Structure formats: structure tokens, C-alpha cells
Curated annotation (Swiss-Prot):
It comes from the Bacteria. The lineage of its organism: Bacteria, Bacillati, Bacillota, Bacilli, Lactobacillales. It is an enzyme of class 2 (transferase). The gene is rsmI. Keywords: Cytoplasm, Methyltransferase, rRNA processing, S-adenosyl-L-methionine, Transferase. Belongs to the methyltransferase superfamily. RsmI family. InterPro entries: 4pyrrol_Mease (IPR000878), 4pyrrol_Methylase_sf (IPR035996), 4pyrrole_Mease_sub1 (IPR014777), 4pyrrole_Mease_sub2 (IPR014776), rRNA_ssu_MeTfrase_I (IPR008189), SAM_MeTrfase_RsmI_CS (IPR018063). It is found in: Cytoplasm. GO terms for cellular component: cytoplasm. Gene3D superfamilies: Cobalt-precorrin-4 Transmethylase, Domain 1 (3.40.1010.10), Methyltransferase, Cobalt-precorrin-4 Transmethylase, Domain 2 (3.30.950.10). Catalyzes the 2'-O-methylation of the ribose of cytidine 1402 (C1402) in 16S rRNA. This is Ribosomal RNA small subunit methyltransferase I. GO terms for molecular function: rRNA (cytosine-2'-O-)-methyltransferase activity. It holds the Pfam family TP_methylase. It comes from Streptococcus pyogenes serotype M3 (strain ATCC BAA-595 / MGAS315). Its EC number is 2.1.1.198.
Amino acid sequence: MQVQKSFKDKKTSGTLYLVPTPIGNLQDMTFRAVATLKEVDFICAEDTRNTGLLLKHFDIATKQISFHEHNAYEKIPDLIDLLISGRSLAQVSDAGMPSISDPGHDLVKAAIDSDITVVALPGASAGITALIASGLAPQPHVFYGFLPRKAGQQKAFFEDKHHYPETQMFYESPYRIKDTLTNMLACYGDRQVVLVRELTKLFEEYQRGSISEILSYLEETSLKGECLLIVAGAQVDSEVELTADVDLVSLVQKEIQAGAKPNQAIKTIAKAYQVNRQELYQQFHDL
């Protein structure tokens, strides 16, 4: 067991600060974040060029150390040595909270293992910011980060998560969003979803509706900018009622036309609408 008293313990080692940065609007930078970045000895940045612009805007002269997913393994021992020697470090990502979809978690774990104080500053977070304005249930919720890119892996992911009652959040590229929603529709059914893009920026947009409605909208509207997808959790009662008005056999046939094998198509639709797979099999084959 380990007990950390962030501001009371007198240690010879430095402190690792996790500093959030704006996700699009520089006015979201906090006074404490600016002060911390000025006071630490080094800033560990995911992209030194991107962070350099932020530092210049706020007149911060602290030296940067490049720290990203491609060099984290080799850099972490050196960073821990700096902390043990008494230097304080701030870790930042390109936007938002460190450790969320970046290598910060590994650095935090290494610091804790070395009994180094880790202090997180509150601030901008894309997932929570979008969630509270989405209109979907804010709790319970689960954030998955970036989805698998390959269609097969993505479908398997959705099939595994379709019955979860929590509101689900994902990052996705605007170039893949239609394919992702199509895969989600096949596995989750036509749930409520909110597609958020350009969060905190001039062209911030929330698209709220069912998955099929969002897909129809995207057929007529181009999509640009960073996207965050929020999906309602499974509601058994409503999904059972929905199946009474849905031609499940036709949905199975559509899956087959899209390239799925009959048994896999039956399994996918049975999971999406929470019906007995054997009964759907018999219905499809008219047994």
C-alpha cells in the first residue's frame, strides 16, 4: 500500500505534474496550468512543435522534452532519473488530459513505482465536455478512446460491448465515421447517438439522433474535424419492444448481402436485438 500526501510530504525527489491543455480554445487554459508550466524544470510534450506554439502564446520559456508513444519506452527511465534527482516535470498531451489516449499512463505508473509524487491538474477533457452536453445519460459511462480500424476487429468489438448499459464514448476519424456507424447499427441496433465535432472551436457541432438518422444526414453532409462519438447504453426493455416492429429476417439478409456468412449474420442480428439465436435461425430458414 502507498499513501501520497501531495503537498505535505517533504521529499528530495521532484514532482510529476499532469497538465491539461486546451482542446481547441486557448481561453480554456487555466491560470494554474500556466503557472505550473512556468515553474517546472522540464515539460514532457507529445509534439514539441504543437506545444511550442502553446508555450509561446503564454510566454512560457521552460525547456521541452519530446515524449510520445514511439519513444516512451526509452525515455521513461531517463525521466524517472530526473525526478529522483529533484527535478520537477510537467507532462502534456497535444490537447486535453494527459494519460488519455497518450503514453502518459506508463510514465505515471513508473513514477508511482519509484515513490515519486504525481499531481494531476483539472482542466479540459474532450470526453466529459461532450458527454455533459450530449443529452445522453452521463452516468454510468465508459470511454474507450480510438476504435479498431479494421472492419472485422471493429465488429467483434461492438458485438462484445452491445449489451453494456453504460453510455459509451469513442474517438473516430471523420473519414471512417460512416463505416463505423454502419457497423455499430448492425451490432447495436438503431440506438440514440451523438456525434460531436470541432469541440470548443468555431465550428463546434452536435449531431443528435438515432444511428440511422445520423447516417442519412452524413450522406448529404460532408464531415470535417476531430470527432467524438457518444452512444446510448443498452436498454433491454426498449430493445425487446423494438424487435416486434423490425423484420429481423430482412436484416439477416442484408448482412449476407454485405458479405457475411449466414450463421454469422444470424449471430450478429440476434445479439443486436437480444433475441434467441436458435429461434432466429429457425425463422430465417423457415423451419
